[in-house]
């Protein structure tokens, strides 16, 4: 079983990475160090997570210790949509690179397709609490990102939270120089994303699954929300393989050739989440897990629902 996915650029992206969304700055440094010690080589970051400085410290410490070399790591970050204008894009990218203490990124993604008004706030709002949008679109942002590739600062580009119509528009953009190599989206047994994955793979675009465990620690979680980790059928499959529910949920993606980035700051869980290459889910088990789909999203970004380009209005 391959431990990586080959991108359209021929680069190898490790199929399991460490997610860092919601990892508090005071804990994320130790989490990244624990992950590198456990064998992770793919770290998923973002400007909007406000913890890249600590992630960078961890990476540098591990490189200094000779535990790992920079070229063995696959580091991903994301451009927030308040920075779609070229000048702001360059500044945001530079901040990410400086915080991570790197001289290049392996992959740089557009975090969200809707352009937002530039400024200090991640979600700029007017007096009525309505989100303020920007006229600069993701297509214009892409041109600025392509320049980063041409300058050798980024190896590959991708998108996140895009539906297939938005990807189609990007692929059909006149003068497109660098195609997206991945679409990072929420994906788990309650949101199996079959049509979107099929579409992306048909275009030579890999898929990365975030919130693979259902994001139980998300800020908007409600007590009545479904819990993947507590799902009796998932627990049953896990018990059969002498694995945990989390390991089954991660393995589910690997067998679909989908990159998966579980988040944890607990060293024992970080280790557990990568111990997923020594068992195989049967075709029957995969079909059972796929049948759990209910198009349930943990991460809706409700602030932007009534704006143009809201990605989840489309079926996929």
From Swiss-Prot:
Example GO BP: polyol metabolic process
Quaternary organization: Monomer.
Keyword Ribonucleoprotein: no
Induction profile: By FGF-1.
Lowers pKa of active site Tyr (site feature) positions: 78
NADP recorded as keyword: yes
The species this protein was found in: Mus musculus
Positions that bind NADP(+): 211-273
Active site: 49 (proton donor)
Cited PANTHER family: ALDO/KETO REDUCTASE (PTHR11732)
Pfam family, one: Aldo_ket_red
SUPFAM superfamilies noted in UniProt: NAD(P)-linked oxidoreductase (SSF51430)
EC number: 1.1.1.21
Positions bound to substrate: 111
Disulfide bonds: none
Name listed for the protein in its UniProt record: Aldose reductase-related protein 2
Annotated GO MF terms: aldose reductase (NADPH) activity; all-trans-retinol dehydrogenase (NADP+) activity; NADP+ binding; NADPH binding; retinal binding
Keyword annotations of the record: Cytoplasm, NADP, Oxidoreductase
Classification via CDD domains: AKR_AKR1B1-19 (cd19107)
Superkingdom of origin organism: Eukaryota
Family of this protein: Belongs to the aldo/keto reductase family.
Swiss-Prot/TrEMBL catalytic activity: an alditol + NAD(+) = an aldose + NADH + H(+); an alditol + NADP(+) = an aldose + NADPH + H(+)
InterPro entries according to UniProt: AKR (IPR020471), Aldo/ket_reductase_CS (IPR018170), NADP_OxRdtase_dom (IPR023210), NADP_OxRdtase_dom_sf (IPR036812)
């Amino acid at each position: 079983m391959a431990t990586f996915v080959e991108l359209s650029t021929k680069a190898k992206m490790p199929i399991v990475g460490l997610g860092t969304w919601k990892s508090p700055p005071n804990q994320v440094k130790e989490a990244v160090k624990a992950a590198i010690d456990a064998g992770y080589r793919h770290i998923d970051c973002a400007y909007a997570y406000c913890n890249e400085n600590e992630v960078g410290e961890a990476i540098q410490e591990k490189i200094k210790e000779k535990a790992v070399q920079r070229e063995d790591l696959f580091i991903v970050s994301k451009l927030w949509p308040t920075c779609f204008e070229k000048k702001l894009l360059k500044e945001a990218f530079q901040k990410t690179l400086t915080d991570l203490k790197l001289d290049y990124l392996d992959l740089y993604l557009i975090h969200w397709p809707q352009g937002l008004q530039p400024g200090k706030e991640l979600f700029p709002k007017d007096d009525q609490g309505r989100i303020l949008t920007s006229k600069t679109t993701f297509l214009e942002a892409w041109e600025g990102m392509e320049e980063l590739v041409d300058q050798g600062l980024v190896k590959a580009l991708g998108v996140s939270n895009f539906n297939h119509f938005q990807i189609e528009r990007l692929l059909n953009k006149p003068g497109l120089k660098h195609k997206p190599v991945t679409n990072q989206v929420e994906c788990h047994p309650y949101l199996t994303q079959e049509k979107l994955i099929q579409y992306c793979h048909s275009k030579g675009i890999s898929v990365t699954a975030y919130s693979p465990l259902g994001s139980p620690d998300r800020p908007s979680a409600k007590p009545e929300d479904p819990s993947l980790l507590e799902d009796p059928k998932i627990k049953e499959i896990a018990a059969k393989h002498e694995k945990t529910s989390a390991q089954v949920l991660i393995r589910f993606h690997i067998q679909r050739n989908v990159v998966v980035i579980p988040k944890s700051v607990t060293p024992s869980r970080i280790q557990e989440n990568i111990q997923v290459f020594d068992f195989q889910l049967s075709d029957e088990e995969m079909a059972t897990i796929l049948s759990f789909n209910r198009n349930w999203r943990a991460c809706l970004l409700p602030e932007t629902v009534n704006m143009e380009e809201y990605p989840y209005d489309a079926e996929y």
